[in-house]
Amino acid sequence: MSEDFYSVLGVSRDADEDEIKQAYRKKASEYHPDVSDDPNAEEKFKQVKKAKEVLLDDEKRRMYDQMGHERFQEAEKRGATDTDRGRGGMGGMGGGGMGGMNDIFEQFFGGGGRSQSRSGPRQGSDLKTRLKVDLEDAYHGVTKQLTVTRPEECPDCDGAGHPPDADSRTCSACDGRGQQTTVRQTALGRVQQTRECPQCDGKGTIYSETCSTCRGDGQVRNETTLQVEVPAGIRDGQTLRMDGEGAPGENGGRKGDLLVEIRIDDHETFERDGDDLRCRHPISFPQAVFGDTVEVPTLDGAVEMDVPAGTQSGETFRLRGKGMPRLKRRGHGDLYVQVRVVTPESLNEEQREALEAFAEAGGEEIDVEQGFFEKLKSSF
């Protein structure tokens, strides 16, 4: 199964156009075959381009969200996602918009983009939820418990929607087929459409009573706790797919999937920039002047960093390989440490004399008896 387009770009399903464009530029530069050392860079680059093409086209994105990844790709192979035809590109279809395209989808897949009739097995729908993790979890990888409320097969009627001893009769509206067929004239010719029978909800049979537990739905909502494997290096907004943890299928169809969108909490020390991390670290005036070796924090413990003599406040140093793990790739990003020279708030007598001597040696004339605020007051 190929990767969901939202996951390819690392954006949430409600991402706007600017977010998608920004994510595309970042991914495209990361996987461009001319610069990437990833052996699968060319294929990933193609996936990124395809994801951008679909998600930046309003009609294609609407189809994609409605049909899901696999069914959208199947429709695309059949040529059913050519949105230009819905804009008048096929002669006589101008003004048809999505209505005309949806008619074609229903011909291929049935209502809602499904390839099976109601009387046959139907896969359950995918469910979506969010999971919050902290940056340490995203760095090391973690197994998290997630409690979700989801539809499950009714235990009293085994998903049938009626008691096992309920009387039944063949639906007269569809003659027991569970479907009603109509023929429509379109710009592409006569199109036969098959829809679910509204009288029997596609079952072909009408029962004398419904299950009192699920009220005929065949499903009930229950709370369940799942174990979610969060991989090291995952980014904020990326989605994990849990196979078979979605809504139950119908007529023996497989369950849908659970899509877990990862949200990473802000960190008090580090800011994340892709696979890189950034932080600020204080150093003293003597350390900046003479140079020193200081300990700086990383998500894997403190490490030593050399501060050269003459370092200026705001200068940034790069620690290679001390950033985030690269998801599904080898290695880590880098850590960028911006140093800040801290001015002491108070001095003892010895420190004061030393700084006075330093100022005099440099030819600076500073009234050390009068502080800044005293100078400011006396100027008015």
Swiss-Prot record:
A zinc finger (CR-type) spans 141-223. InterPro entries: DnaJ (IPR012724), DnaJ_C (IPR002939), DnaJ_domain (IPR001623), HSP40/DnaJ_pept-bd (IPR008971), HSP_DnaJ_Cys-rich_dom (IPR001305), HSP_DnaJ_Cys-rich_dom_sf (IPR036410), J_dom_sf (IPR036869). It is found in: Cytoplasm. Residues 88-100 have a biased composition (Gly residues). CXXCXGXG motif repeats lie at residues 154-161, 171-178, 197-204, 211-218. GO terms for biological process: chaperone cofactor-dependent protein refolding; DNA replication; protein refolding; response to heat. Residues 115-124 have a biased composition (Low complexity). Keywords: Chaperone, Cytoplasm, DNA replication, Metal-binding, Repeat, Stress response, Zinc, Zinc-finger. Participates actively in the response to hyperosmotic and heat shock by preventing the aggregation of stress-denatured proteins and by disaggregating proteins, also in an autonomous, DnaK-independent fashion. Unfolded proteins bind initially to DnaJ; upon interaction with the DnaJ-bound protein, DnaK hydrolyzes its bound ATP, resulting in the formation of a stable complex. GrpE releases ADP from DnaK; ATP binding to DnaK triggers the release of the substrate protein, thus completing the reaction cycle. This is Chaperone protein DnaJ. It comes from Natronomonas pharaonis (strain ATCC 35678 / DSM 2160 / CIP 103997 / JCM 8858 / NBRC 14720 / NCIMB 2260 / Gabara) (Halobacterium pharaonis).
